[in-house]
């Protein structure tokens, strides 16, 4: 809150409370899963299904309509846990679908995933190499002017990881 206020002031945002988070009810159904074989048509259809799901969920919510809807799906953490599906944030529709771990030990990484996908809804782009997951230099680094450049102590939210070298994070 104080950090958000300071960042908002630095960017010239004159809102008293630039961010407000309200937790809604548990949805009665799951949002549509990402397609197994993503292509332009399947992604477009999935996006429409997700938007429809979000609209139905908002209609059934007694709270005022949100500017951004974030759906958090929690999974088990630990041995035998399934691979986590990708999380996504849609700027058209202001909807984020996040896959998180339901364990206190994952609170930090869950917060990064939530922030990352919310920023996507606002138009932010990824700052990592899609093939390797490695943060891109310099835009994916938390301290772009640091000397020596690696290892980094901080990360760029849109990079998703903290670079320890040019090839590792």
What are these regions (language model features)?
Residues 10, 131-132:
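A generic "cationic amphipathic patch" detector
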Residues 87-92, 96, 100-105, 133-169:
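Metalloprotease/metallohydrolase-associated module, dominated by Zn2+-dependent proteases
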């Amino acid at each position: 809150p104080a950090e958000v206020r300071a960042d908002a002031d630095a960017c010239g945002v004159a809102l008293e409370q630039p961010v407000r988070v309200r937790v809604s009810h548990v949805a009665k159904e799951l949002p549509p899963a990402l397609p197994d074989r993503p292509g332009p048509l399947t992604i477009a259809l999935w996006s429409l299904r997700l938007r429809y799901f979000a609209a139905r969920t908002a209609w059934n919510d007694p709270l005022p309509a949100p500017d951004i809807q974030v759906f958090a799906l929690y999974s088990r953490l630990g041995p035998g846990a399934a691979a986590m599906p990708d999380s996504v944030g849609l700027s058209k529709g202001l909807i984020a679908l996040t896959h998180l771990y339901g364990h206190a030990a994952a609170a930090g990484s869950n917060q990064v995933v939530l922030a990352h996908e919310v920023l996507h809804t606002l138009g932010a782009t990824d700052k990592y190499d899609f093939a390797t997951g490695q943060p891109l230099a310099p835009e994916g680094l938390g301290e772009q002017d640091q000397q020596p450049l690696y290892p980094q102590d901080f990360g760029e939210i849109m990079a998703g990881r903290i670079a320890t070298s040019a090839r590792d994070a």
